[in-house]
Amino acid sequence: AAMAETRPAVRAARWHNYNAIKDTIADAQCDPVQAVADIIAFAIWNAQRVNDPYKLCRIHESGDFFSLTYFLAWIQVAREHPEIKFYAYTKQLEYWLGVHKSGCIPDNFYLTASMGGDEDYLLDQHPEVFKRVAVVVYTEEAATQHGFEIDHDDSHCFGDKPFALLVHNNQRKGSDAAKALAARRRQGSWTGYNK
């Protein structure tokens, strides 16, 4: 959200994509999952025409899966592109659990549970499913106290244990998160992820 505020073109592109996908879901005559998967796959193909082929694709820089259809479409895209590792952070644990139970998550699709959502109760109920859990902390000391390694480069998204992320990017003015980030900036410490 913070990037969208500082970069209007990014915000406009994200809303365009969101609306295109929602319209496709609403207008799909047969299979909305495949219709959305086709849009996503076309966007990947189009981006690769002018860039190097993707080996890694992070789903959402910010945001989450807004519907089960959208979630399933990404799984379909991963199935169709086994040469690409897809990964995402999500609080949509019920979607993940349902698809996991059906055995339909491909090997190149990595999900990390983002702690702090309404479905966190599922984390303790299904630790065999939710092995990768990300917890946002304000300081390196807090991560150490909880026994978490800090992920600075998304590499922990491919492991099998919980990890911490330091609070980053822009935070609401006056919030504890903003104060923690400002303190790290004053110390010359790490304050953000490279995209």
Residue ranges and their predicted role:
Residues 1-195:
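Class I S-adenosyl-L-methionine
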